[in-house]
Amino acid sequence: MNQLEMKKLAAQAALQYVKADTIVGVGSGSTVNCFIEALGTIKDKIQGAVAASKESEELLRKQGIEVFNANDVSSLDIYVDGADEINPQKMMIKGGGAALTREKIVAALAKKFICIVDSSKQVDVLGSTFPLPVEVIPMARSQVGRKLAALGGSPEYREGVVTDNGNVILDVHNFSILNPVEIEKELNNVAGVVTNGIFALRGADVVIVGTPEGAKVID
């Protein structure tokens, strides 16, 4: 079974958490694209969705699913998103697709965060296999980079990428994140940082892992 098939298994399994007549929070990325496709099969059951990226909005509309603005929704029953890494405490690194800020906004609206991944995304320590994305106001890129280097990381400017919010991304390599909650807070207090890709203050409630043996639910 290849990686895409495992992603599809996890995405399909997430449908069990979708309740009738609700608005579903939807993240972004390749695994979420599989979920949007699956959600299209039950589109008549739901009111619509709030999306964390423009790409996800477009895919939802292609499936015939109504897209709501986050400002028009007071809460969401569930938020479904993928992860670049996830640890045993259900804390994540996200932002490989540069949608981390909007993902945090939509996740904060949700009563339950469902994280869908394939088994390659599971790690013991965040930062083990994937650099930490940090969304930065463009004029602060250099000074934030110096601060990240002083904290022990190796920041790299993600060339040619502008977020949906008009900002830039620094990917921090060689950054072992042993205390995700504290590091998430510390980095978010750096002047010029919009947010960072650690999802620890608001981690996942349920993790669905696509494996060669099927979808495994961790709650």
Curated annotation (Swiss-Prot):
Provide the coiled-coil residue spans.
none
Positions with a binding annotation for substrate:
S28, G29, S30, T31, D81, G82, A83, D84, K94, G95, G96, G97, K121
Instruction: From the UniProt record, give the pathway where this protein acts.
Output: Carbohydrate degradation; pentose phosphate pathway; D-ribose 5-phosphate from D-ribulose 5-phosphate (non-oxidative stage): step 1/1
What are the EC numbers? 5.3.1.6
Keywords for the protein's UniProt record, in alphabetical order: Isomerase
Q: Which reaction does it catalyse?
A: aldehydo-D-ribose 5-phosphate = D-ribulose 5-phosphate
Name the domain of life this protein comes from. Bacteria
Q: Which GO terms describe its molecular function?
A: ribose-5-phosphate isomerase activity
Q: What protein does this entry describe?
A: Ribose-5-phosphate isomerase A
Species source reads: Haemophilus influenzae (strain ATCC 51907 / DSM 11121 / KW20 / Rd)
